[in-house]
Design a protein with these regions (language model features):
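Specific alpha-helical transmembrane segments that line the substrate/conduction pathway
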Residues: 93-99, 106-156, 202-208, 258-278
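Hydrophobic/small/kink-forming positions within alpha-helical transmembrane segments
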Residues: 42, 46, 73, 95-103, ...
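Residue-level signature of the transmembrane alpha-helical core
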Residues: 35, 39, 66, 92-96, ...
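Hydrophobic transmembrane alpha-helices of multi-pass small-molecule transport proteins
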Residues: 67-72, 127-132, 143-161, 287-304
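Alpha-helical transmembrane segments of multi-pass integral membrane proteins
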Residues: 125, 155, 172-189, 212, ...
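Membrane-interface interhelical linkers
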Residues: 2, 6, 10-43, 47-93, ...
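Hydrophobic alpha-helical transmembrane segments in multi-pass integral membrane proteins
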Residues: 72-81, 129-144, 182-199, 242-258, ...
Length: 305
């Protein structure tokens, strides 16, 4: 995998190919970017899960991804680079699977199965890159890092699971599982983008995802975007945080392995839970509290390892 650094500000993160002492600085910075990514995903998920109850999931998906296109179009102007054709292809494939994943997850939310959709998608999306990094890429995390990865996956399940009555269980479970597979594949494709590629592959990623969502929205309903102004604005805000998460994730990959960054960036359920308690007055279950603590410990172990 080509991972070289460039001279622009956003490309000034050290490459994986530099000396060992340089990597000692890189990895903590990588974890910081991964944590910023998980906060961004959590905020995006918080806004999107709420609006998906009131608006059509297809229309919410289109708006979320439209926001990503708009933000990346501006960002790419200032984030120059030297992308190869392979970088652009990986960006396009990341967009295709990401668009499908967002659509399926929002459909699961719309069916009222948030309690099982959120933990299922979160666990799968973090597990797929870990298996890929270890089994395919041959990565060998340290014992401390491996402990953090395992604890992180368990923490994801605990913090995102909600008690209470389950509705539309099996259908939501299947949709969330497939969505998690697509999100995991998105992480893998993003990891193949070179450090000096700049922002254009991520712009292509968002355009491809938007085209998928827009096509589905137009073929299944009369509108491409939510009919209410509130629904559109909320979805757009979710999209801004969503693309921020992608950018932070790619930056995190420059100093850490795919397995480590994916698990650290997948702790977004903790953010969603805290926002739900603070803003919506939702109840925090005791196991979610354990999950929040586990998430913090997992990130700490990954950083130390």
């Amino acid at each position: 995998m080509r991972k070289t650094s460039a001279g622009s500000t956003l490309n000034a993160i050290p490459s994986k190919t530099v000396a060992t002492q340089h990597n000692a600085y890189c990895v903590p910075v990588s974890v910081i970017y991964a944590v910023l990514s998980t906060f961004s995903i959590g905020l995006s998920d918080f806004f999107a899960s709420g609006v998906s109850k009131r608006e059509r999931a297809n229309e919410v998906s289109s708006t979320v991804l439209l926001a990503g296109v708009a933000v990346m179009a501006i960002t790419t102007v200032f984030w120059s680079g030297h992308p190869t054709s392979l970088d652009q292809v990986h960006g396009a494939f990341a967009g295709l699977v990401n668009g499908l994943g967002i659509l399926l997850l929002f459909l699961a939310y719309a069916r009222g199965s948030l309690r099982i959709a959120a933990p299922t998608a979160a666990v799968v999306m973090s597990t797929v890159p870990v298996l890929w990094d270890i089994l395919v890429s041959g990565s060998s995390p340290s014992t401390t890092t491996s402990t953090g990865i395992v604890l992180g996956v368990v923490a994801i399940a605990l913090s995102s699971y909600e008690g209470g009555h389950h509705v539309a269980g099996s259908g939501g479970l299947f949709l969330a599982f497939v969505a998690g597979l697509f999100f995991g594949a998105t992480f893998i494709f993003l990891s193949r983008i070179g450090n000096d590629a700049g922002g254009s592959p991520l712009l292509i990623q968002r355009i491809a995802a938007f085209l998928i969502a827009a096509l589905v929205a137009r073929s299944t309903g009369p509108r491409m975007f939510p009919k209410t102004r509130e629904g559109f604005i909320t979805s757009f805000v979710a999209g801004i945080f969503g693309i921020a998460a992608v950018v932070f994730f790619v930056l995190a990959l420059r100093g850490g392995s795919l397995a480590v960054v994916s698990v650290a960036a997948s702790q977004y359920a903790a953010v969603s839970v805290l926002l739900g308690v603070a803003i919506r007055g939702q109840r925090m279950w005791w196991w979610q509290g354990l999950g929040l603590g586990g998430s913090s410990l997992a990130v700490a172990l990954i950083a130390i390892g």
